[in-house]
Amino acid sequence: MGKHRDLRSSYPSSLRDHNNLYQVSRFEEVEDPTIEDFINDNATISFGIVYFKNIRLKNPNFGFPYISTDRMLAGALSDIDYISDNGRVLKCSGEFTLVITDVDLELIMRIYDADKIDINLCLTAEAAPLPKWEADFIDEYFKNKSDYKNILKDLEKAFAPDDDVFDANNDLTKVKNMFNAIYGLHAQDPCKGLLIRDEDTDEIEEEEIDISEEIDKYYGFHKNRFQKSSRGFLPYSVGVWCTAYSRRKIFSEIFIVCPPSGSNSAGRGLYVDTDSLFYLDNEATEELFEIDNKRCYDEAIKNGDYITDNKGNIINYNSFDEEDEFMRFKFLHSKCYAYEQKTPEGAKLKVTAAGIAARKLKGMKDGKPDYIYKEEEVKTLERFNDHFTFKECGSTKSGYIKEELKTVNIDGHMVECGNACIITPTQKTIKDFGLKQKVYQFEKMKTGRN
């Protein structure tokens, strides 16, 4: 049987759970850095430029490669003969560099072998837990999310009127958005120029900026000491390491199902996303997941990293929750998969495809909205393939009209109008992002010749 598990509130969990997260000193360069300088257990965070030569998976059967093909090619130092799948490197002959964090290098070294790894540049800063005011703020919205989920479940169980369920679902969505926006505030570009509109041509351009000056303004560095400014009260570095720690957490769950250097890697893991994993379960795997969840729960109780919801339940961060079971699973590429969910009534098709609407309004039936859902359009798992076209739930396209603000007469009505965006439905076809084997010719790409 297949199972699907999700990390509970992945990014907020990483914000609340990790001590080495909040940058409290300026990044300093390490002289003659080693891998040990780059990856350490002290209260520091590190990033820099790392050199790699001739990499390959430790186990060819491991189904979750880590290194991005695009980032590898962007840092190419020679011709590179590589094999990639779904935008991730399986094997590469050649030399390249990556700009990565300490967490990334730790994961890469667990998954890949390389002929050579060197640290070209290592920048390190002291780090500390989030300030209490932000931790409390995250807890507040975590509780709100948990409470609204309970309210929605109670309404659904009681077969409440559709309007009540709809309103409760909207409330939950708003709370989730605010909860996740806390991480988003740490992920704003610290060096973004103002957008300037030319009143004559109506063209919009971004102002040119001096990056080093903008970084100094953002972090408020004065007289060689770290002094946060009002503009930099939520450091960008927190967003960087939050996502890095979240990647490490999901890979720790992947390694339970598929050890990167063991013989059990083949066939057990099916698909991984930012915070979810689809896999083939067995008794030993489920026991390991529950042991890990128990460890996270005990640590949360000890450290106070939990909330109590409106039903008196203790809800902790970092749990890897079981979502559903499935009988068949089909993966095409990132954010594009389908499976037959196991239910008491039998198999139920579930489809996930980026950019595809969950449903489309066909009209009214018996006084109620009549929708067609994306699963109805796909019909069966066998029909879900590369080049399948969603004709009903496809997507939308936008057309923009530039016009001076004016008042016009439309059928006797005086209507004020101006710039407009016309949104119309459109079809969407699934693309093929399969296995690729290519030779990247460094000299041709460097000079712009093909």
Task: Set out the residue ranges of the language-model regions.
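Conserved acidic
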Residues: M1-N450
